[in-house]
Swiss-Prot record:
Chief localization: membrane
Source organism of the structure: Mycobacterium ulcerans (strain Agy99)
Biological processes, Gene Ontology terms: lipid metabolic process; lysyl-tRNA aminoacylation; response to antibiotic
Annotated protein name in UniProt: Lysylphosphatidylglycerol biosynthesis bifunctional protein LysX
Keywords for this protein: Aminoacyl-tRNA synthetase, Antibiotic resistance, ATP-binding, Cell membrane, Ligase, Lipid metabolism, Magnesium, Membrane, Metal-binding, Multifunctional enzyme, Nucleotide-binding, Transferase, Transmembrane, Transmembrane helix, Virulence
Length: 1105
């Protein structure tokens, strides 16, 4: 999968001279190639002799043989193509010098016509070249990284000196016609002078083979110096202790998301930070590719800043940007910066909570583990900090001894070190044989605070089969005790290709691609890695490679192969310890003094506080008013004031204080809502749950401090304890005359407008705590709800009912036809359902002899959200033995009327009266009772009953434009007609009796009317409030009905009940004749208060922002 970039990477302005670097590089590269071939082959030397001599004499230095000069020109050509400014300067200097020499020869005169032609042509070419180079100056913008120039120069001098001495000795042994006094200058010209001096300056010639040898000695010295310089560039620019310390701090703050984050501390990488210091990218430069390692480290909000800094770095030095192992989130960030993304493969993630050895998919692992255990293997798991130094040395020796390659591989997904004192949080998993000898081991690095990521896997050649499987399984099974919730295993390249190519019906391209991968797996173990991870049934997380454009994909690929260690270049220093000398941390971060030179993690709390002090909170962006209040809190604390002290009960509530006598000493606590300052006198309004009171702070009355102290310390919304005497202000307003006060809770966020409060309904739902603090209506509603719940309990308790609690997590969803919420228990590895009703468990209690029982609790249905529905709601279910559904008509009416009395002070329901007002409507007395069929008949204007056939009902539904499903029976169509034509249009509370049996699977058939169930629904103002049944107690009939429901569930009906065998077994012990009631308490509260369900619930479910 390839993700294309939405915009181009920001680059320099393209000018008409953009071709100059490439042209200059090609020109010099051609001369370098021909010079090399001429130094090797006499035939080539003979073929190009004439043009070579002309170029060498008039245009550019081109000796007959010189390996050293060929090497120099090759470096210069590569640098020119890479737009290196130093290469531009060297070439320009060479051309200017050549032009000067040509001009001098022309001015001197005395030349032949051929020489004049050559010198004039050469001078003209040089002038043109100088003009082009000068005009193309801005195209050579890239720099060269810092390196050990003096060390490289010393190597070059020493190598050149050795080459000169050896060459001098050779020319003394085989002088040819070279004069003795010219031998040392001649070899010096050939070894370190690149044969630039005219051969005519020397007397005689040695053998041409020696000329090649002299140039080779010079080339070897140059190559050695170049290698030293390039290696020093990487080593000098690698991580310093401060860099590593900063990275570790970022990992502790933000390292939970990326399993590869800890590998950013690999010390042969370089790093570049965002200017804020809150994000960084680690990278390595290979063959001109700046290869970033995975995602940026740090705050994702600062990733783009770090990526931009990295891209600018690439542009500065002329590197091609590339990324290895980016996650989906990281690839999106790189894509936003202008790169393309190509899916490389997938990372295998084990979630220990879901891991088990049981099941058919785990058969292979289970058998391998069994074999390993039979061989007597045990597993030991320890943190590196718990391993002694001597034992760690043995561990390192074992890791080196069992490695099947000369050097350690890895870059983006490997740490490259074992047993380092800075890695004490790493985890070591060891397999021990019966003699307690280690036969295999895994080392895993931290992944945030609760994960580990595989770094190293080793096993002895003598370890039994199944050793690795045993270690991985034991780690997953013991993970909870180790505080581990995620385990990152190996990375499988091109995983999707293996899966798609092996699928039935895979196309020829997919099969060919898979065959190629299998073929190359003989050397690179691509398929082996996939198979070794797949058997654990992990979660596969994609990883991506990023690149600038398609033409650099091969270059980025080769750089990745080199960086990962699959291709080891000569003189590679993969096993060397790299310690950089140039810290990359931003000055503002280094200036905090929190970073450590040894690379250990800084004080994270200090790092966070430092960011906050700079106005750059790593956790959140704070509004100005919040920052002002935080600063005030800081000042209070510095003054020794505890803004959040231990509580002391006030002597009075506000309501009690208002009723107290004048001069009575009272203490109240509450929230400050308004403040009026008149200099030495200050008025404030304080509110607690019982009411609001004016408090008066007068300098002459305060026992300690002044009113100005209150004004300076207190903001609107703060919680304050006031102590003083009751009295009145000069205007006669009843007030608390404050003697002393105490801040008991600093409010860090401003309250809404003090006059209007919260007016946005959505804001009131999301911040109910603020709504309750400022809105008296919200407090009235929550009080009314409490009164309704208390009244329901008291009414039922007075009738002899006992309250019970039944399971919310249930193995079978039943008790009602509704779509359930599904969850999962890891311990038993099975799905559970949040109950849609407590009915089946309450009936079990009825079987056990509990004759009057009720439960008032939460139920859950995965259905719509509107003014009368919330997925989580309060449900009352009550059962009375030796009763039927008609008994519950009076009891239900009494429950609701009592609840209205408790909430409103009278048996009334609040109804809209226009203009946003509510008016009470009486609900006392006896309520209407109708049968369902009679009510539907009234609405249709045509009589129907339980015997009306399905065709007639469908005709009536079509006439009334009521939709129905083809698979519905007559009862379901009647129910649909009832819901549309009767329920939605009902005003005063009405009981609708005798529903069709087919839509009441848990209800007893009517005692005298076939096809009718003894059930009623209570409806008021278009809302169903409750339902009651004469419960079905016949276990045989009950089984038949539930089996019908289970068939519907198996057929795909998500609302149909499942077959609860345990419930049916309980029913077979016989349940007495019982009447049952189910009532939606939330809807009763809505009826009584006249408000929607979202207003009456303290915390209704709100859609995420």
């Amino acid at each position: 999968m390839t993700v294309t970039k939405p915009r181009s990477v920001q680059s320099r302005h393209i000018s008409r001279y953009d071709w100059v670097p490439a042209a200059a590089g090609w020109a010099v590269g051609v001369i370098a190639t021909l010079s090399l071939l001429a130094s090797i082959s006499p035939l080539v030397r003979w073929i190009i002799k004439v043009p070579r001599e002309f170029i060498n004499s008039y245009l550019f230095n081109f000796p007959d043989t010189s390996f050293a000069w060929s090497f120099v020109l090759a470096l210069l050509a590569a640098a020119l193509a890479a737009r290196k400014r130093i290469a531009w300067l060297l070439l320009l200097t060479n051309v200017v010098l050549a032009a000067f020499l040509n001009a001098a020869d022309i001015a001197a005169g005395g030349n032949t016509a051929a020489q004049n032609f050559g010198e004039n042509l050469g001078f003209e070419v040089h002038v043109v070249a100088i003009v082009v180079l000068v005009l193309g100056y801005r195209q050579f913008w890239t720099k060269v990284r810092r390196g050990a120039l003096f060390k490289a120069a010393a190597v070059l001098v020493a190598g050149g000196a050795i080459g000169i001495l050896v060459s001098w000795g050779l020319v003394d042994l085989f002088p040819g016609s070279l004069a003795p006094h010219d031998r040392l200058p001649y070899v010096a010209n050939r070894v370190i002078g690149f044969a630039l001096a005219d051969p005519d300056l020397f007397t005689g010639r040695p053998h041409v083979f020696l000329n090649a040898m002299f140039g080779l000695f010079g080339a070897l010295a140059l190559i050695a110096a170049t290698i030293v310089l390039f290696q020093s560039q990487r080593a000098d620019n690698a991580l310093t202790g401060e860099d590593e310390s900063a990275i570790r701090g970022l990992l502790e703050l933000y390292g939970n998301s990326d399993s590869l984050g800890y590998f950013a501390t690999r010390r042969d990488k370089s790093v570049i930070f965002a200017s804020s210091g809150r994000a960084a990218i680690t990278y390595r430069v290979e063959i001109g590719v700046c290869l970033a390692s995975g995602d940026p480290v740090g705050d994702p909000r600062s990733w783009q800043q770090a990526i931009d800094a990295w891209l600018r770095l690439c542009q500065t030095y002329g590197w091609s940007p590339g990324v290895m192992g980016a996650s989906s989130q990281g690839a999106k960030a790189y894509r936003e910066a202008g790169l393309n993304a190509l899916e490389l493969g997938d990372e295998a993630i084990l979630v220990p909570a879901d891991f088990t050895l049981s099941g058919p998919d785990m058969r292979g692992v289970r058998q391998a583990v069994t074999r390993a255990r039979r061989a007597g293997l045990t597993v030991r798991i320890r943190r590196h900090r718990d391993i002694s130094g001597a034992e760690m040395e043995q561990t390192i020796d074992r890791a080196d001894g069992w490695r099947d390659t000369e050097s350690e591989r890895g870059f983006s997904m490997a740490l490259g070190r074992l047993g380092d004192p800075a890695d004490t949080d790493c985890l070591l998993v060891e397999a021990l044989d019966p003699d307690d000898l280690v036969v295999a081991m895994l080392s895993l690095v931290p992944w945030g605070t609760s994960g580990v990521s595989l770094d190293l896997m080793r096993r002895s050649p003598q370890s039994p089969n199944g050793t690795i499987e045993l270690m991985v399984s034991e780690l997953a099974l013991r993970a909870e005790g180790l505080g581990i919730s995620r385990i990152s295993l190996n990375f499988a390249m091109f995983r999707s290709a293996f899966e798609q190519g092996a699928q039935l019906g895979a196309g020829p391209v997919a099969r060919l691609w898979r065959w190629l991968l299998v073929f190359f797996s003989r050397w690179w173990q691509i398929e082996t890695l996939y198979r070794s991870n797949q058997k654990y049934q992990p979660q596969w997380v994609p990883r991506y490679a990023c690149y600038e454009d398609a033409r650099v994909i091969p270059k980025v690929g080769v750089a990745s192969v080199i960086a990962e260690g699959f291709l080891v270049l000569p003189f590679s220093r993969r096993n060397k310890v790299h310690t950089g000398h140039h810290p990359a941390v931003p000055e503002r971060l280094a200036a905090t003094g929190l970073l450590h030179h040894d690379g250990s993690a800084p004080d994270v709390s200090g790092l966070r506080q430092s960011a906050i002090a700079d106005g750059d909170d790593p956790q959140r962006r704070l509004p100005e008013q919040v920052r002002v209040r935080l600063n005030k809190l800081k000042k209070l604390r510095s003054s020794g004031i505890d803004a959040y002290p231990v509580g002391e009960p006030p002597t009075h509530t506000v309501a009690q204080a208002m009723d107290a006598d004048d001069q009575a000493s009272v203490s109240v606590s509450g929230r400050i809502l308004r403040v009026r300052n008149y200099g030495g006198v200050l008025f404030a309004h304080l509110r607690d749950w019982s009411g609001e009171i004016q408090v008066l702070l007068d300098n002459s009355r305060l026992g300690q401090g002044r009113a100005a102290d209150f004004n300076a310390a207190i903001d609107l919304g703060d919680l304050v304890e006031m102590t003083g005497q009751m009295g009145s202000s000069k205007t006669g307003t009843r007030s608390l005359i404050v003697r002393r006060w105490r801040l008991i809770g600093k409010c860090l966020r401003p309250l809404p407008n003090k006059w209007n409060g919260l007016t946005d309904p959505e804001a009131r739902v999301r911040t109910r705590y603020v709504d309750l603090a400022v809105n008296a209506e919200s407090r009235t509603l929550i009080t009314a709800r409490s009164a309704v719940l208390r009244s329901v309990r008291e009414t039922l308790s007075a009738k002899g009912f006992i309250e019970v609690e039944t399971p919310i997590l249930q193995q079978v969803h039943g008790g009602a036809t509704a779509r359930p919420f599904i969850t999962h228990i890891n311990t038993y590895s099975m799905d559970l359902f949040l109950r849609i009703a407590p009915e089946l468990y309450l009936k079990r209690l009825c079987v056990g002899g509990v004759e009057r029982v009720f439960e008032l609790g939460r139920a859950f249905r995965n259905e719509g959200v509107d003014f009368s529905h919330n997925p989580e709601f309060t449900l009352l279910e009550a059962y009375q033995a030796h009763a039927d559904y008609r008994v519950w008509i009076d009891s239900c009416r009494e429950l609701i009327q009592n609840a209205a009395q408790a909430a409103n002070g009278a048996p009334v329901a609040m109804r809209p009266a226009g203009g946003g007002r509510l008016e009470p409507v009486g609900i006392s007395g006896v309520w209407a009772v109708k049968t369902v069929h009679d009510a539907v008949s009234e609405a249709l204007g045509e009589q129907i009953d339980a015997d009306t056939d399905l065709a007639t009902l469908r005709r009536l539904a079509d006439a009334a434009r009521i939709p129905y499903r083809a698979q519905w029976d007559a009862g379901a169509v009647v129910l649909e007609l009832y819901e549309h034509l009767v329920e939605s249009r009902t005003e005063q509370p009405t009981f609708y009796l005798d529903f069709p049996t087919s839509v009441s699977p848990l209800t007893r058939p009517h005692r005298s009317k076939p096809g009718i169930a003894e059930r009623w629904d209570l409806v008021a103002w278009g809302v169903e409030l409750g339902t009651a049944y004469s419960e079905l107690t016949d276990p045989v009939e009950q089984r038949l009905r539930l089996e019908e429901q289970s068939l519907l569930a198996a057929g795909g009906d998500p609302e149909a009940m499942q077959l609860d065998e345990d419930f049916l077994q309980a029913m077979e012990y016989a349940m007495p004749p019982t009447g049952g009631l189910g009532m939606g308490v939330d809807r009763v509260v809505m009826l009584i208060t006249g408000r929607s369900i979202r207003e009456t619930l303290p915390f209704p479910l709100a859609k995420p922002h």
